[in-house]
Amino acid sequence: MSETTETKFTPRFKTKYQETVAPALQEQFGYANVMEMPRVVKVVVNMGLGEAAKDSKLVDNAIKDLTAITGQKPVINRAKKSIAQFKLREGMPIGAHVTMRGDRMWEFLDRLVTLALPRIRDFRGLSDRHFDGNGNYTFGLTEQSMFHEIDQDKIDRVRGMDITVVTSAKTDDEGRALLKALGFPFKTN
């Protein structure tokens, strides 16, 4: 029998965090314990589909786009209440979201920072004011075409999305330092 040695693949951003970012954060903030250091816990990509109330095909196309971008199947968000003014009935699909953890999360962050964000037209950097007070960062993208996985010719409708990077940081300064060290392009005011 032949022996096969399986080499475990480690995402580039995860290696960067372990080798350079974590020691730099420990030195900057003076953490005594390794578990005190802020780290990325999960990334949530949310796509609102308000227009799906009129056309159900939009949900399928949005799911295909989110699946291509994130690499996993999204969960459909459904309306909890009926609202007549919005022509919305209880149980109708109004959005989709994906929660990524582990290696898939690190790969997505790598693709987002190195490939997708630089492709945005007139991109001057992310605002550093979108932290929530607990070190989590949320920002919106206006279109899905900046991701290489989306075929430009097959886009039926421009869809935006919200991306939330949840960290274990206790303050916004720790979260900002973590994301800046990972390579997030924040604006310099």
UniProtKB/Swiss-Prot annotation:
Q: Does the keyword Nucleotide-binding apply?
A: no
Task: Tell me the InterPro entries matching this sequence.
Answer: Ribosomal_uL5 (IPR002132), Ribosomal_uL5_bac-type (IPR020930), Ribosomal_uL5_C (IPR031309), Ribosomal_uL5_dom_sf (IPR022803), Ribosomal_uL5_N (IPR031310)
Q: Which GO terms describe its biological process?
A: translation
Per the record, its GO cellular-component terms are: ribonucleoprotein complex; ribosome
Specify the signal sequence span. none
SUPFAM superfamilies linked to this entry: RL5-like
KW Ribosomal protein (keyword) present: yes
- What's a Pfam family in this record? Ribosomal_L5
Q: Which domain of life is it from?
A: Bacteria
**Which keywords, in A-to-Z order, does the entry hold?**
Ribonucleoprotein, Ribosomal protein, RNA-binding, rRNA-binding, tRNA-binding
GO molecular function terms noted in the UniProt entry: rRNA binding; structural constituent of ribosome; tRNA binding
State what this protein does: This is one of the proteins that bind and probably mediate the attachment of the 5S RNA into the large ribosomal subunit, where it forms part of the central protuberance. In the 70S ribosome it contacts protein S13 of the 30S subunit (bridge B1b), connecting the 2 subunits; this bridge is implicated in subunit movement. Contacts the P site tRNA; the 5S rRNA and some of its associated proteins might help stabilize positioning of ribosome-bound tRNAs.
Subunit field text: Part of the 50S ribosomal subunit; part of the 5S rRNA/L5/L18/L25 subcomplex. Contacts the 5S rRNA and the P site tRNA. Forms a bridge to the 30S subunit in the 70S ribosome.
Under the heading PANTHER family, the entry gives: 60S RIBOSOMAL PROTEIN L11-RELATED
Q: Which family does it belong to?
A: Belongs to the universal ribosomal protein uL5 family.
Q: Protein name, please?
A: Large ribosomal subunit protein uL5
